[in-house]
Swiss-Prot record:
GO terms for cellular component: cytoplasm. It comes from Prochlorococcus marinus (strain MIT 9515). Peptide chain release factor 1 directs the termination of translation in response to the peptide chain termination codons UAG and UAA. NCBIfam families: prfA, PRK00591.1. GO terms for molecular function: translation release factor activity, codon specific. SMART domains: PCRF. The lineage of its organism: Bacteria, Bacillati, Cyanobacteriota, Cyanophyceae, Synechococcales. The gene is prfA. The modification N5-methylglutamine is found at Q239. This is Peptide chain release factor 1. Belongs to the prokaryotic/mitochondrial release factor family. Keywords: Cytoplasm, Methylation, Protein biosynthesis.
Length: 364
């Protein structure tokens, strides 16, 4: 992006920021909580960009002043050396700020700010795959709790040997999808299962789907397309067994999608949760169809996000996690403890690089 074009876009963003601040000071808006919250969010999103823009303008002025000072001190070698050193530092800062604001101005995925439904399914590997699915669920739970998101299982099919055949987790918070969308795909584990008497390393897999939550307005569901049954929720026996049919078994006939929801205490709550999951699944189908139409012949470097794509291998023997999209290795234990920031940040940087390259190609 040419520098003059960049500055023009930053000036537009700065004007929008000033306008939002004026709206926040408007008594009428102050008395409208929903509108106030919306405007405050928009202002918060723009503030870092505007601060960086102001710093860029200040740096430009310092560079101009230093160049003038250099002209005025041509005969003073010591002063010339100091000014050139300062100019070098200012140019480095300017280039860093240009890269930062350019990335901030790149087109954003409109779904990035949404909460998600995260679905984990045991893949190849039998009981060990189910146990691995449970390990992944705990990893995401720890990551979400560390950030301050609300993490809640809303549908689960447990395995007799531990873990889950399938699990759907609701993760609510700010910009959840922007972080977790890179987790979609096949997660492979290489380790010696607890049930392995010979000490042999087994390879198992689990599939992760990350579905941005959809509003009812975005996904229309015809009630006649639904087949809804009820069942008793499973329990640990004794007083914990649910004698009332609170579980919901929901089938969307056109797609064959089935959702079995048992986690809530009442049938109504389970039905609401089942509909949330169904909407997210149907929304994911809509997005995939739209992306397939728009996608160019070249696959995204960060990965297609396809749930059949192997994205990561967790090797317990070598205490190593390999992200195949990045071609990078990470320590295993911190990753499983929910410390995913390093790998997710690297995926974000890779995606931003790709978007910037595409943007520059289109500009040319």
């Amino acid at each position: 992006m040419e520098y003059t074009t960049l500055i023009a876009r930053l000036k537009t963003a700065s004007k929008s920021f000033v306008n939002l601040e004026m709206q926040l000071a408007d008594p009428d808006i102050a008395n409208n909580p929903k509108k106030l919250e919306l405007i405050a969010k928009e202002r918060a999103k723009l503030e870092p960009l505007v601060l960086d823009f102001n710093q860029l303008l200040d740096t430009d002025k310092e560079i101009d002043d230093s160049r003038q000072l250099l002209k005025d001190n041509r005969n003073d070698k010591d002063m010339e050396l100091l000014i050139n050193e300062e100019l070098c530092n200012l140019e480095v800062l300017k280039n860093s700020l240009i890269q930062k604001v350019t990335i901030a101005l790149l087109p954003k995925d409109p779904r990035d700010e949404r909460s998600v439904m995260l679905e984990i399914r045991a893949g190849a590997g039998g009981n060990e795959a189910c146990i691995w699915a449970g390990d992944l669920a705990r990893m995401y739970e720890r990551y979400g709790q560390k950030i301050g998101w609300s993490v809640k299982p809303i549908s689960a099919s447990e395995s007799d040997m531990g873990g889950f055949k399938e699990l759907v987790i609701s993760i609510k918070g700010d910009s959840v999808y922007s972080q977790l969308k890179f987790e979609a795909g096949v997660h492979r584990v290489q380790r010696v299962p607890a049930t392995e008497s010979q000490g042999r390393v087994h390879t198992s897999t689990a599939t992760v789907a990350v579905m941005p939550e959809a509003d009812p307005v975005e996904v229309k569901i015809d009630p006649s397309d639904l087949e809804i049954g009820t069942a008793r929720s499973g329990g640990a026996g004794g007083q914990n067994v649910n004698k009332v049919e609170t579980a919901i078994d929901l089938i969307h006939k056109p797609t064959g999608i089935r959702v079995f929801c048992t986690q809530e205490r009442s049938q109504l709550q389970n039905r609401e949760r089942a509909m949330e999951i169904l909407r997210a699944k149907l929304y994911e189908i809509q997005l995939k169809e739209a992306n397939d139409k728009e996608r160019s012949q070249r696959l995204m470097q960060v990965g297609t996000g396809d749930r059949s794509e192997k994205i990561r291998t967790y090797n317990f023997k070598d205490n190593r996690t390999t992200d195949h999209r990045l071609g990078s290795n990470f320590a295993l234990e911190p990753i499983l403890a929910g410390q995913l920031d390093e790998v997710i940040d690297a995926c974000i940087a890779q995606e931003q690089k790709r978007i910037m390259e595409d943007f520059n190609e289109n500009e040319n």
